[in-house]
């Protein structure tokens, strides 16, 4: 668990490092103002990323601005507009809706704000609008989970999926999960998706919807 937490902190630090490398080339300033926009801060993963970003900013003498849009893409876009208006040099961005991020990304590009996309990767058509991407191999993570389920439940299982269906990272994770089952059992039909619940990327919401589903 400690290693996983340190890896997430490193993700935030890497994002700040990438921002610094990009902005130095474009504008020789002693320090920069960096915006951080996750789609929620009710998830321990994103608070750990925030800790990593804050630590790296403190160590490099950069200023950090961040908001919690609370799983509201409209509010996230509005908060990013506010950060741009305040004069941020770069944005570390975890979009709520990876397929609907183009408007925000274009606004940043037009304003000269560098963007590092992390975790929930934008669609390939929008790659040219960002300056860097940091993400886990979510397909492989899902695959390994599916492989474990197949190997440890050889007779099959009823599966409850906790999803965030606007997040590409979750979509490919779930796809990888089912492939992991299919590739590692001869009776894949015995593994049934009995329900999909919306966790909204929130630990508390996920706990509540799973509790309700299991009753």
Residue ranges and their predicted role:
Residues 2-8, 14, 25-215:
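A residue-level marker of the well-folded mature domains of exported/periplasmic proteins
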């Amino acid at each position: 668990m400690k290693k996983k937490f340190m890896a997430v902190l490193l993700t935030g630090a890497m994002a700040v490092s990438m921002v610094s490398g990009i902005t130095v080339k474009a504008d020789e300033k002693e320090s920069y103002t960096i915006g951080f926009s996750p789609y929620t801060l009710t998830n321990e993963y994103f608070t750990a990323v925030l800790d990593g970003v804050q630590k790296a900013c403190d160590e490099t003498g950069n200023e950090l601005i961040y908001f919690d849009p609370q799983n509201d893409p409209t509010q996230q876009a509005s908060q990013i507009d506010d950060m741009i208006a305040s004069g941020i040099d770069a944005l570390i961005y975890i979009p709520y809706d990876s397929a609907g991020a183009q408007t925000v990304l274009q606004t940043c590009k037009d304003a000269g704000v560098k963007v590092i996309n992390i975790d929930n990767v934008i669609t390939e058509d929008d790659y040219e609008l960002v300056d860097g991407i940091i993400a886990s191999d979510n397909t492989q993570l899902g695959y390994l989970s599916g492989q474990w389920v197949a190997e440890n439940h050889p007779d099959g299982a009823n599966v409850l999926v906790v999803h965030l269906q606007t997040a590409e990272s979750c979509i490919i994770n779930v796809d990888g999960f089912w492939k992991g089952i299919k590739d590692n059992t001869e009776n894949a039909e015995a593994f049934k998706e009995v329900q999909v619940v919306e966790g909204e990327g929130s630990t508390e919401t996920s706990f509540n919807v799973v509790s309700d589903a299991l009753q």
